[in-house]
Regions:
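Positively charged n-region of N-terminal signal peptides that target proteins for export
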Residues: 1-4
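Bacterial N-terminal signal peptides
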Residues: 6-15
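Extracellular glycan-targeting catalytic surfaces
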Residues: 18-224, 230-237, 253, 257, ...
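Secondary-structure capping and boundary motifs in well-ordered enzyme cores
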Residues: 119, 176-180, 228, 256, ...
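Inter-helical turn/loop segments and adjacent helix faces that build the functional surface
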Residues: 134, 194-205, 243-247, 295-304
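Carbohydrate-active enzyme catalytic cores, enriched for enzymes
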Residues: 232, 237-243, 280-433
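Long, repeat-rich segments with strong aromatic
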Residues: 243, 247, 253-299, 396, ...
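Catalytic and substrate-binding regions of extracellular carbohydrate-active enzymes
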Residues: 359-547
Length: 547
């Protein structure tokens, strides 16, 4: 292991009785050596290294011109009419590619700056890794230039939130502490990779002008159990490890209300699903957790618990036959193969075959594959065949060799939950048959008007109203002899109405019975959304009415 030369100190953590991690924060010298070896012996690893070096060369070839102000919330950057993502025509002109509407002024003008700041953050990481893997000093010098540039500017960037107000929860570089944290993690990792090339005065400027102030802004905004807090914990914890601050490390890991261990204990259900009930946010949370888990591992603090491992298992349990996640709640989740980089790390730490198979299902073109991935991975399908009940999370997947039906019946899921108790997603004949709407950019009015309405989901709405944000319950679950039966109840989502859905899957036959009971008279709409095109012999006329 490379000795600490320019930054040589050891911090003892009173709570853990261990030393601070090696100088490179998220990777050891031996892992860097192994990455070089993999690149020499395996073409895919060589391609990842070449791509990294190409990005570093691009950063080296561009002058460092940091934005004059912080960036804005990217969810603003969509057309209010049709939800399409805007195209940047100039710093003050942003055009919808569908309807041609042009947006000017704030918040639109500052959204491209969000992406520019993100590019500089990733450049610091890429330059640092490229320096460690090649030894080229000019790469470290460019990373240092970016770091010192931000150190000189960070506190002068106005504090601002999504609405342009100087409030807690906003950031200096970004418009919310979530994005400030996501931005800071690669920055502090990159700093640790080039730190020994900085003078003592330069290190002081980076740490006191950038890292500590950024951690302070993030810490001031306190959340509880939430995916955002997981990102904040990693950002603050990594700064703590990088600058040798025991208080920051302990807060990130052991704070009883919001630390890493609290997130595992209270944010992960006993089934392994993140409590927000969205597979997209489940994976987003996994992306937030690993940097702190790795930095702690190198400090001999073990955060790789059974509950943490369960986070990697739950998405496999709920996957549809093609690897897609059931599209429940905000940020529906995508395909398992898209999260293969996370499973590279999981397989490296736990060695479980199913994790390795998910990693093998990806392209292996990620930094995680190069830096942490095994040279060879197990092969084979991870698609589950048996029906499964996640009782605590409130999800079930009924499976036969021909059909899969996923149903959501339990906890609402907080702010990212949808009003869709007893919603089902179905898959058969090699394709989705029953669709969930998922979500679009949150700044688009259509997100609330349609995507978070009950009628947009495959369930029952009452009197044209949206369900209340209440939990449902399991009434019956039985899976035996090739037949699976599920019954769920939602008796609090509408006043005076009990909704009960029974699904029974036997081979290719899915029987679906929906009972609605009440002492009063109501209008019940039972929606089922399937892919297809509308054709009609009648003349159709567009009508503008509320959804």
């Amino acid at each position: 292991m490379r000795p600490l030369i320019a930054f040589g100190f050891i911090v003892l953590l009173a709570s853990a009785g261990v030393a601070a991690p090696p100088a490179y924060l998220l990777i050891s010298e031996s892992e860097l050596a192994e990455a070089r070896r993999k690149a020499d012996e395996h073409p895919r690893a060589r391609q990842v290294l070449d791509d990294l070096l190409e990005r570093a060369e691009e950063a080296l070839g561009r002058p460092v011109e940091l934005p004059a102000r912080g960036g804005q919330w990217p969810h603003w950057y969509s057309c209010k009419r049709d939800g399409a993502r805007l195209k940047t025509i100039s710093p003050t002109e942003h055009r919808c590619p569908v309807c041609g509407t042009v947006y000017r002024g704030e918040p639109y003008d500052s959204v491209p700056l969000y992406h520019q700041h993100g590019q500089y953050s990733r450049a610091v990481r890429d330059l640092g890794l490229a320096y460690r893997l090649t030894g080229r000093a000019e790469l470290a010098r460019r990373a240092k230039e970016i770091l010192l540039g931000y150190a000189a500017r960070y506190r002068n960037y106005p504090l601002h939130d999504r609405f342009g107000e100087a409030k807690t929860g906003g950031g200096h570089v970004m418009a919310q502490t979530l994005d400030e944290s996501v931005w800071l993690i690669p920055v502090v990792w990159g700093y640790s990779l080039v730190r020994e090339t900085l003078s003592e005065e330069e290190r002081r400027r980076v740490e006191e002008g950038l890292l500590r102030p950024a951690a302070g802004v993030i810490r001031e905004h306190k959340l509880g159990i939430h995916n955002i807090q997981c990102w904040k914990n990693s950002a603050v914890g990594l700064v703590g490890f990088a600058v040798g601050d025991e208080e920051l490390i302990r807060e990130a890991i052991d704070d009883p209300q919001r630390g890493f261990r609290a997130q595992m204990a209270r944010g992960v259900t006993s089934d392994g699903l993140w409590f927000e009930g969205s597979l997209g946010y489940h994976h987003y949370t996994m992306s937030a957790l690993w940097p702190l888990a790795e930095a702690a591992r190198l400090a001999e603090i073990d955060l790789y618990s059974d509950r943490y491992r369960a986070l990697f298992d739950a998405p496999i349990s709920l996957a549809l036959p093609n690897g897609d996640s059931p599209g429940f709640n905000d940020n529906a989740g995508g395909n398992l193969s898209g999260y293969a980089p996370l499973y590279e790390l999981a397989y490296a730490r736990w060695g479980e075959s199913r994790h390795g198979k998910v990693a093998a299902g990806g392209s292996r073109n990620s930094l995680e594959a190069l830096l942490y991935g095994a040279a060879r991975l197990p092969e084979g399908s991870v698609a589950p065949e048996a029906s499964i009940l996640l009782r605590d999370a409130g999800y079930a997947a009924l499976r036969s060799p021909l059909v899969t039906a996923a149903v959501r019946f339990g906890m609402h899921g907080g702010g990212h939950g949808h009003p869709d108790k007893l919603n089902v997603v179905t898959y058969g004949a090699g394709r989705l048959a029953g669709l969930d709407p998922g979500s679009i950019n949150y700044g688009v009015p259509l997100h609330q008007e349609w995507y978070k309405s009950t009628i947009a989901h495959n369930t029952v709405s009452v009197d044209g109203q949206i369900q209340k944000n209440e939990d449902g319950q399991l009434e019956e679950w039985r899976s035996e002899g090739g037949v699976t039966k599920f019954t769920g109840v939602a008796d609090r989502v509408y006043d005076g109405v009990v909704l009960r859905r029974t699904l029974e899957l036997d081979g290719a036959e899915l029987r679906d019975r929906f009972e609605c009971s009440s002492d009063g008279e109501h209008t019940y709409d039972w929606a089922f959304h399937a892919p297809g095109r509308i054709s009609s012999s009648l003349a159709l006329e567009a009508v503008a009415v509320p959804l």
